[in-house]
């Protein structure tokens, strides 16, 4: 009789483990209770998540948001399984982190991007640029490249072919007015606006400087730009959990019209909902081309 009971318990445990690991997705105890634990940066990520809480609650999910003030721990706590997801980073940062730290994090969905903009300093229009004027840009690799690409898109400079999202000042091929590019830490760029012709800022620093992207920028990245697609801020999860019910619910709400409206109204262009329709269109086109090639081969 005792042996029969032990077999029953063992069978129950085995079935439970099988259910928890079905399709390679490990469901945490918190997920069973309807709780989604997310690590996030304060602005705008945690603010957006707070707006999503009541919507998720209506769907039966409790959203537990913890704010982190660094860019390392949010990934480590997701890798360890202590948190279900994080919301603070873009894809290049995630890829680099995985490579350097040996983690296994993946993109579960793009939510927003923070567009770079060119803002007035001592000059109001790019047409007012004169020989030897100075433009201030961030000096870190990622943000400097975005700034230089934006200047190129607006006819200020020309970069070498292929420079792309790794461009530096050394890649400037044409500079008709010999504009001086002053490289500063990102947080310092807006502080020299009274000393230079223009400053090039990311959305969050534009907000801190009192700029409105939609009203004050002379030019800014668009939602279909290479930079927007590359530097979209994402929900990141441990590999294998991207298709879990909880994560899909979270991403769906963050991409809903309610959250898009909140982002547009609150951040006035400094934070923009990511529109992946163009990306999907590109993917569909690529698939159609592949099918056409297959038919031709047949």
Regions found by a protein language model. Name each.
Residues 19-33, 298:
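Sec-dependent signal peptide cleavage junction
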Residues 32-43, 61-67, 133-135:
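Short, well-ordered beta-strand elements
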Residues 65-76, 164-191:
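Short helix-initiation/N-cap motifs at beta->coil->alpha
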Residues 79-89, 133, 156, 177-180, ...:
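Alpha-to-beta junction loops
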Residues 96-108, 121-123, 195, 200, ...:
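Ligand-binding "clamshell"
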Residues 108-157:
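A conserved helix-loop-strand patch within extracytoplasmic ligand-binding domains
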Residues 115-126, 231-244:
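A bilobed periplasmic-binding-protein/Venus flytrap-type ligand-binding module shared by bacterial periplasmic
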Residues 145-152, 254-274:
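Periplasmic-binding protein-like
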């Amino acid at each position: 009789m005792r042996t029969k009971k032990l077999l029953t318990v063992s069978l129950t445990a085995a079935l439970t483990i099988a259910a928890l690991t079905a399709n390679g997705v490990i469901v945490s105890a918190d997920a069973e209770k309807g709780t989604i634990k997310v690590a996030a940066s304060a602005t705008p990520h945690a603010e957006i998540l707070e707006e999503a809480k009541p919507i998720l609650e209506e769907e039966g999910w409790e959203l537990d948001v913890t704010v982190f003030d660094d860019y390392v721990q949010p990934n480590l706590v997701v890798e360890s399984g202590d948190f279900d997801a994080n919301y603070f980073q873009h894809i290049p940062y995630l890829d680099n982190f995985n490579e350097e730290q040996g983690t296994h994090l993946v993109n579960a969905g793009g939510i927003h991007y923070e567009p770079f903009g060119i803002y007035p300093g001592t000059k109001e229009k790019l047409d007012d640029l004169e020989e030897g004027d100075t433009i201030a840009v961030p000096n870190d690799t990622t943000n400097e490249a975005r700034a230089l690409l934006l200047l190129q898109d607006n006819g200020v400079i020309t970069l070498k072919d292929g420079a792309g999202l790794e461009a530096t000042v050394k890649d400037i091929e044409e500079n008709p007015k010999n504009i001086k590019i002053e490289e500063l830490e990102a947080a310092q760029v807006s502080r020299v606006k009274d000393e230079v012709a223009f400053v090039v800022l990311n959305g969050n620093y534009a907000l801190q400087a009192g700029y409105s992207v939609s009203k004050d920028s002379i030019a800014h990245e668009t939602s279909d730009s290479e930079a927007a697609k590359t530097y979209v801020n994402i929900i990141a999860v441990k590999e294998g959990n991207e298709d879990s019910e909880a994560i899909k619910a979270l991403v769906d709400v963050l991409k809903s019209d309610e959250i898009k409206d909140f982002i547009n109204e609150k951040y006035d262009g400094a934070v923009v909902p990511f529109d992946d329709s163009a990306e999907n269109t590109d993917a569909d086109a690529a698939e159609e081309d592949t099918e056409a090639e297959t038919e031709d081969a047949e």
